[in-house]
């Protein structure tokens, strides 16, 4: 099993004031799976992604990725894990305004252990014509594609997407989701995607539903092409 979470707990406060962001959450994913995570705000979705991304630590339980126990590795190993194993895409694009599209991607490539080709990635993401443009010259969808390219250039084993289409219109959302399906197939990248949009769920191999820090549904799904979804 590529990703294993077992009885993971993340809590804030003590005694009667304790709030569980994750409450004994367990999950197993195979390499190359695409997983959509559903749930209301505050349910623990982002906490789960932060744990897998090495951005936060569990109070209890174990998280193992590709045989590596994230709770027992050194700080140096954790930094290398975040740098080389994990790509993260947020709803906000987090681009460097004074750099072109190509330069934004190159910044990440230059600190990565086994990066992909910038030119191939630009072509895969359909933004090769915008390589010399600055972020302010791009549409929202083009900026999100650039953000995805920044996350992918390091050739990560895991891509974590936190509401990546939340700020996009329906057509652009569809384009970005089709792109993620393409990436998943071409690079065998394990993708976990948070969304409030129930209609997106059928695009995934696995559908998780989180409520009050607990995984209350874990459904194996026969994925559908994004073009067939009512987004």
Question: How would you describe each model-predicted region?
Answer:
Residues 214-231:
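Conserved beta-strand-loop-alpha-helix hinge in the C-terminal portion
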Residues 2-204, 209-210:
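ABC family nucleotide-binding domain
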